[in-house]
Amino acid sequence: MKTLGEFIVEKQHEFSQATGELTALLSAIKLGAKIIHRDINKAGLVDILGASGAENVQGEVQQKLDLFANEKLKAALKARDIVAGIASEEEDEIVVFEGCEHAKYVVLMDPLDGSSNIDVNVSVGTIFSIYRRVTPVGTPVTEEDFLQPGNKQVAAGYVVYGSSTMLVYTTGCGVHAFTYDPSLGVFCLCQERMRFPEKGKTYSINEGNYIKFPNGVKKYIKFCQEEDSSTSRPYTSRYIGSLVADFHRNLLKGGIYLYPSTASHPQGKLRLLYECNPMAFLAEQAGGKASDGKERILDIIPESLHQRRSFFVGNRHMVDDVERFIREYPDA
């Protein structure tokens, strides 16, 4: 049995930018995940369920667990003095860590993805993305350090809190998964160099919004539902409502996750920096593909901290198909 810490140290030689700082940074995220796991598992016993009464910068009502997870991860990262600053879905602006100007890395995170599901005991997750800063070491970080394209990520991953808690990450050398053993207090390696199955047969989208979708996405959904034995259609529809949970299932079973633009969200709804980029990095490392319907996600130059984007991620052939439908059936 190999632990996450042992695995990271063992694989450092595969990573060109390997440093003790990055290893310690991943360990800090691991600690934060353990704390969140512990409290999610007793969420019904303590007063951390439901809405907090506050809103985040996007105008969305924050759940108590959103704020709890944000504070715990922020504290875990700050305590190690290895991160110069963070950007979070739950913070209006970047958070600069005073006294950490010497640190080389910045972290972007969605502390608790799918938190509206927690009240009904459905899987939720944490998403993280790590970059090397671009401003001089020794100075406070600025927004410039965070507004980097996804192809500059040095590591990314997620934690899914479900029937078991699992941490999945990449440093650009494959995707690896670790299951948390609460009796030992460690994450243990369960899958190394994960890959999407050759063919996907599942599509994940909130079909309740069908009438609001672009024409190309509507046509693709109909394509998924048509019978064609040569392409194993119709595909199965599965949608949990938590990006981490839906992505994780599709990574294991094969499939595509779709979150297109709508009239109310013409740029899309998912955040480019906190959700799309890290998941796109993982997808490509697992042999998949991620796109906004027209452009590779990892090549998009971000313009603002909380920028949104349409998002299609999963098996390469399925993302290719949805891109083709979007090209062939443009909106009037």
UniProtKB/Swiss-Prot annotation:
Substrate binds at D113, G114, S115, S116, N206, Y239, Y257, L258, Y259, K269. One of its GO terms (biological process) is fructose 1,6-bisphosphate metabolic process. InterPro entries: FBPase_C_dom, FBPase_class-1, FBPase_N, FBPtase, Fructose_bisphosphatase_AS. Keywords: Carbohydrate metabolism, Cytoplasm, Hydrolase, Magnesium, Metal-binding. CDD domains: FBPase (cd00354). Binds 2 magnesium ions per subunit. GO terms for molecular function: fructose 1,6-bisphosphate 1-phosphatase activity; magnesium ion binding. Pathway: Carbohydrate biosynthesis; gluconeogenesis. Mg(2+) 2 binds at D110, D113, E275. NCBIfam families: PRK09293.1-1 (NF006778), PRK09293.1-3 (NF006779). Homotetramer. Belongs to the FBPase class 1 family. This is Fructose-1,6-bisphosphatase class 1. It comes from Salmonella typhimurium (strain LT2 / SGSC1412 / ATCC 700720). The gene is fbp.
